[in-house]
Design a protein with these regions (language model features):
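Glycine-rich beta-alpha loop elements in corrinoid/cobalamin-binding modules
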Residues: 44, 63-241
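N-proximal short alpha-helices
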Residues: 2, 21, 25, 104, ...
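Loop/helix-junction capping segments adjacent to catalytic residues or to phosphate/diphosphate-binding pockets
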Residues: 38-39, 185
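Short N-terminal or domain-adjacent regulatory/targeting segments
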Residues: 1-23
C-alpha cells in the first residue's frame, strides 16, 4: 500500500490505457460488477472502490464483463497485486432478470440505456468461476447483496430448489456480507502486509469454507445450522414453494 499512489482521478480506471495514464503497472485490487460503473454512492462497487482508494490502494473496475466470448474482459487488466473482488451489482441478478412470475424483464435499470442482457444469471457464481479458472492462485473476495443473501443454504425461487452457500458454487476464498467497507479495507491492509488469505478468518463480517468444524463446535458462541445435505433430505425446497 502506498498512500501516494491514489489515482486522484475523476473516475477509477476501467481499462489498461487508463491505468497506464495514472502511471500504474498493476492494480492492487480489481473489482468486477454486474452493473455499469457509475461513480455514485448508490452503486456499491463505486463505494467500495473509493473506500479502498481512500485507504491508499490502486483500484480498477471491470463493469459488466462479457462472459460469453473469449473472456477478454476478465484478462484485460491482468492480475491484481492483492485480490479480485466480485459483486452482482445493486440487485441479485435473478431479481434483476425475472419478475415474480418468472418472466424475463425487458430492461435493466443499472445498464446504460436500460438495455437488458449485459449480466448473466447468478452473476457472482459465473464471474467467480471464470476468474478462478483463469487465475486459480489469486485470492477472490465476493460481496454485495447476491453474495450476502446467499451465504447459507437457501431456497432459490427461480429453480425451485435448495442451493448450497454461494461460497461453494463460486469457489470464492472469502465472502463479505452486509455493508462491507470496514472488512474489505482490513482484508486489503492485511494482505498488503503479507498475510495469507487463510490468515484473515478472524475478521468480523466475513464467511469462508472450512472442513475443520470441531474448533467451532466447542465455542459457546457457535450456532449450528442444518447442513445443505440435511436440508435437501428434508425436502425443504418443495415445502417452500407449496406454501405460495
Amino acid at each position: 500500500m502506498d498512500n501516494t499512489s491514489r489515482s486522484n482521478s475523476k473516475f477509477l480506471p476501467t481499462t489498461i490505457k487508463e491505468m497506464r495514464a495514472l502511471g500504474w503497472e498493476q492494480a492492487d485490487i480489481i473489482l468486477f460488477t454486474g452493473d455499469a460503473y457509475v461513480d455514485h454512492p448508490s452503486f456499491g462497487a463505486a463505494v467500495i472502490g473509493r473506500v479502498l482508494e481512500n485507504a491508499g490502494f490502486k483500484v480498477a473496475i471491470v463493469p459488466q464483463p462479457n462472459w460469453r466470448d473469449d473472456l477478454r474482459d476478465f484478462k484485460k487488466l491482468g492480475e491484481p497485486r492483492l485480490f479480485f473482488a466480485v459483486s452482482s451489482g445493486c440487485m441479485d441478478s435473478m431479481v434483476n432478470h425475472y419478475t415474480a412470475n418468472i418472466r424475463l424483464r425487458s430492461d435493466d435499470a443499472y445498464t446504460p440505456g436500460g438495455v437488458s442482457g449485459y449480466r448473466p444469471d447468478y452473476a457472482v457464481k459465473v464471474y467467480s468461476n471464470i476468474i478462478k479458472k483463469i487465475y486459480p492462485n489469486i485470492p477472490l473476495v465476493i460481496g454485495g447483496i447476491e453474495a450476502s443473501l446467499r451465504r447459507f443454504t437457501h431456497y432459490d425461487y427461480w429453480s425451485n430448489s435448495l442451493k448450497p452457500s454461494i461460497l461453494i458454487d463460486s469457489e470464492a476464498d472469502i465472502l463479505v456480507y452486509g455493508m462491507g467497507e470496514k472488512p474489505i479495507v482490513e482484508i486489503a491492509q492485511r494482505l498488503s502486509r503479507g498475510a495469507s488469505i487463510y490468515q484473515l478468518r478472524d475478521i468480523p463480517q466475513i464467511g469462508y469454507v472450512d472442513s475443520n468444524l470441531e474448533k467451532y463446535s466447542k465455542s459457546k458462541n457457535t450456532i449450528n445450522l442444518h447442513s445443505y445435505d440435511r436440508s435437501e433430505e428434508r425436502r425443504v425446497g418443495k415445502e417452500c414453494r407449496s406454501r405460495w
